[in-house]
């Protein structure tokens, strides 16, 4: 797990400023049905054994987005097939660095054990976007989307939970992995990533979003330095400001010592189902996992929920 964590960090380390990397994991409850292939005797026996059983289907999408190209819209409208030639020089350099960063990231991810990365076709993107908008209900149906305190799409209802501020994180350091407590004690110990309980371990329809925004390493470091100066000059006013000053100062020293790259991040999980009973079970489990891991969370509604969806 540590090695995968290191390779993930290295893969995205050289993305240019203004880049969003969005990892989206979709988990859907489905009934297992064997394919048309015959296979061996054992394969056919396994297929009969699992026929009709419930399982979780997992799809992982990795989105790369570059923001801030001022001349892109005009260039694309005037010539969709040759828009690069009409970009301003500064925007063209940003785009080239962005595409190079994607190639480097994918190359590193491809070398991770048991990992393959495939480009999505136009048809696949269109089908996925349509299915996602309808919360993976009837793909041929056109449904209404209603948003109040929760999300209603056709027969499906959804609830979302977001970790969108550093104050929502647990105090102290966060481990990249924890012990797997889902299995009975044995001679050996198993481990999994911290939030894996909201992945394949969560037996409900759900979507996990992890977004990293590369706002600019030097820009964010300068902001921390300014905040330290502000808190430092006012630290004698009360104990809270003094404590914040000491924590920021300690953080800055760790960043410099480890040469860490600073980014902004966002995490959310959305559970959905056509059954209110199943939705309540999923809701209870998500809250339990977040609370046990000492994460605070925001439950968006109305306008903010619409923006998330």
Where are these regions (language model features)?
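Extended, folded cores of ATP/NTP-driven motor/assembly subunits in large transport
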Residues: 1-309
């Amino acid at each position: 797990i540590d090695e995968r964590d290191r390779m993930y960090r290295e893969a995205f380390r050289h993305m240019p400023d203004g880049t969003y990397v969005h990892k989206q994991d979709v988990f859907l409850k489905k009934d297992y049905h064997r394919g048309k292939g015959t296979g061996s005797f054992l394969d056919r026996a396994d297929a009969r054994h699992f026929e009709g059983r419930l399982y979780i289907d997992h799809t992982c999408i990795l989105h790369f987005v570059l923001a801030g190209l001022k001349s892109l819209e005009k260039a694309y409208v005037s010539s969709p097939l040759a828009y690069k030639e009409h970009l301003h020089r500064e925007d063209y350099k940003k785009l080239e660095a962005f595409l190079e960063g994607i190639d480097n990231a994918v190359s590193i991810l491809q070398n991770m054990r048991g990992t393959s990365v495939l480009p999505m076709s136009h048809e696949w993107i269109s089908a996925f976007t349509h299915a996602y908008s309808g919360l993976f209900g009837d793909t041929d149906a056109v449904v209404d989307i209603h948003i109040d305190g929760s999300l209603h799409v056709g027969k499906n209802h959804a609830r979302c939970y977001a970790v969108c501020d550093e104050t929502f994180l647990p105090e102290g350091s966060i481990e990249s992995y924890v012990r797997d407590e889902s299995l009975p004690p044995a001679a050996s110990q198993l481990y999994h990533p911290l939030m894996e309980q909201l992945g394949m371990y969560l037996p409900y329809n759900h979507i996990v979003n992890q977004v990293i925004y590369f706002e600019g390493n030097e820009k964010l470091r300068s902001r921390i330095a300014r905040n330290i100066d502000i808190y430092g000059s006012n630290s004698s006013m009360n104990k809270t400001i003094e404590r914040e000053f000491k924590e920021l100062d300690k953080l800055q020293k760790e960043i410099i010592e480890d040469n860490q790259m600073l980014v902004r991040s966002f995490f959310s999980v959305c559970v959905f189902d056509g059954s209110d009973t199943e939705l309540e079970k999923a809701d209870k489990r998500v809250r339990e996992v977040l609370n046990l891991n000492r994460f605070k969370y925001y439950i968006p509604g109305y306008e903010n929920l619409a923006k998330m969806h």
